[in-house]
Structures are given as C-alpha cells and as structure tokens.
C-alpha cells in the first residue's frame, strides 16, 4: 500500500465486540492489554490519540429494542452507557502501562469521568494524554461510527482509523468468502453507494464533507497501527 499518510493526531475506533475476544460477551483482559500496548506504541512515537469504543460486547440498542419491550430510544441510551463501561476499562488498561488517560462522556457522569468539552479534549491531547470518548454522540439513533467521525472532526484529527479483525476493506466478507478481494483505496462515493461495509452512511458522509480520510486496518497484528500511521506502511485500506 503506497498511500501517504502524514499526521500527528488520530482517532482510533474499534468495536465493543472486539473487546470480548473469542467470547460472546464482556471484556477479554488479554485483548484489552493488547490494544493498550498498541496505543502506547503510538504515544511513544509522538502521535496524539483519541479513542472511541463501541458497546456491542455488553448491549446494542437496536438489538435491545427488537423484542418490543424496550423502546429504541431507551435501548440506544443503554448502549451509550455500555460504551462508558468499555471506556473506563480501557482507561484502566492504558494507565496500568503508564499512559495518562482521560475519559470524556457525551452524557454527564461526573463521578466517573469528565463531560465532553472539545477544547478540553484538545488540551489533553496536546499534553500527550490519551482521550477516550464515551456515550456516543449523546443522542439516540446515531452509531458509534458516526460518533467517532464526529469527534475526529471536532478535535482536528488527520484521519480516523477503524481498527478491525481484518486487513482492510474487501468486496465481500473475507471470513465467509475465500475469493474476497481486498480494496486498497476507495472513494467516499463508492463507499456510500456500494454494498461494501465500511461505516454507516452518516459517518461516511460526515467524513466526506470534512475531507477526513478513513483507514481500515487489522488491530490484532502487532505493530500494524504504528506502521500505518507513522511509516505509511503496514496492511490497510483507505477511503478518501
């Protein structure tokens, strides 16, 4: 992959399901530790890092509302709280290995974390702290992909990284189809109109309107995040 990326501030987004590891629910401590060490390698190379984590390892708002008992709005708020749980867990993992970390929530939970204030978030980043953004956008009906894109734009990230279990963007699910073809680069429009799953349309449209590159890469390959960001190498795909 030859696409050039030169940046100092990034936002890394990964799913809550990734935290569960091979389990279907909860947080795998080994996965948490691996991610923390990958983030540390970025900080040690003078990269300012913001993080958004999904909450699907605990609850998903859409799924919670399917039974008809829990309304979608309430289900989404439950999902936001799940992301705060994951954010606090990641904060603990990062601080355990020596990284100064702050959690900022879009919903006020002052006993646990700071409320989201973008100027304060930027100041934390400038001081070398990792900032984890919890509770999505603070509004129902918006995904954590959209929240991640929004936060990336607000804090002036050079790109948003969607860290996954695969090596990039494929024309179909590589876990199901052996003939899946990896796409190194993709336009915003192609990502919007095609059947290729990158992010939801709202997130991609936000990125397009603000010329924010989207990078999809494998977070489970040791050192890959740093290779992608710092050295313009590694295995990844880009939407731009």
From Swiss-Prot:
It catalyses: UMP + ATP = UDP + ADP. One of its GO terms (molecular function) is ATP binding. One of its GO terms (cellular component) is cytosol. Its EC number is 2.7.4.22. It is found in: Cytoplasm. InterPro entries: AceGlu_kinase-like_sf, Asp/Glu/Uridylate_kinase, Uridylate_kinase, Uridylate_kinase_bac. UMP binds at residues 55, 76, 137-144. Inhibited by UTP. Pathway: Pyrimidine metabolism; CTP biosynthesis via de novo pathway; UDP from UMP (UMPK route): step 1/1. It comes from the Bacteria. Keywords: ATP-binding, Cytoplasm, Kinase, Nucleotide-binding, Pyrimidine biosynthesis, Transferase. One of its GO terms (biological process) is UDP biosynthetic process. Its main location: cytoplasm. Disulfide bonds: none annotated. Homohexamer. Belongs to the UMP kinase family. HAMAP family: PyrH_B. This is Uridylate kinase. The lineage of its organism: Bacteria, Pseudomonadati, Campylobacterota, Epsilonproteobacteria, Campylobacterales. The gene is pyrH.
